[in-house]
Regions:
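Active-site-proximal alpha-helix that buttresses catalytic centers in soluble enzyme cores
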Residues: 1-84
Length: 84
């Protein structure tokens, strides 16, 4: 079963993290044919972490997880950390 994991930076501001969760819910509704499972995760400053997000997908039955980076610009994390 295919899963989509939305990965955002994460923020100390809870409202920003909540916006990522709202986006994941919208993706879940619009991508249901291709991705039966959709979760969000964060690189830092918020939970779930990326490994936890992958575990959540697997727990829900995923056999394949597609990572969707959600960053607004090409900073250090986008260029160096995410590809690793």
């Amino acid at each position: 079963m295919n899963a989509l994991l939305l990965v955002a930076h994460g923020s100390r501001r809870q409202q920003s993290n909540d916006e990522v969760t709202v986006l994941a819910n919208k993706l879940r509704a619009s991508c249901h044919e291709d991705y039966r499972i959709v979760h969000s995760s964060f690189l830092e400053l918020a939970t779930p972490s990326i490994p936890e997000g992958i575990e959540n997908c697997i727990r829900d039955g995923a056999t394949r997880v597609t990572i969707l980076p959600y960053f607004l610009n090409s900073g250090t994390h986008v260029v160096n950390d995410v590809p690793e």
